[in-house]
Amino acid sequence: AVDFVLIDAPPHSDTDTRQALRAAHLTIAPIQPSPLDLWASKPVADLAEAANFPLAFLLNRTPPRARLTDAIAKGASELGGTLLKPRIGARVAFAAAMGEGLTALETKPKSIGAEEVRAAAKAVLKLLQ
């Protein structure tokens, strides 16, 4: 039996995105702190809203302190759906782990990045309950 299946669908393909939304109990849309990412997330938010699919946004690759991140968070919350409180930072541990075919949870389980991933997972699980 499978408890979770993650589908990584491109935001630019309306058909793929619609199929992924239909199959999901919850859609997580990662957004980097950039206006382009926010604008690219609008079609996904519109599809989710039109079909009444649950949607949450996760800020990803965030710098430690940047006003732009807060502005993008505000913009994401205005698109509809839920804005997850945890943020995943831009961490070297993620890239280094990927080079080994692993995750930061495996290579650096006590790192800030691993803690951020655990916090995001906990927030997602809470939405699914």
Q: What kind of region is each of these model predictions?
A:
Residues M98-E116:
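C-terminal boundary of histidine-terminating zinc-finger modules
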Residues P10, L21-K42, P63-R65:
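Conserved Switch II/interswitch segment of TRAFAC-class P-loop GTPases
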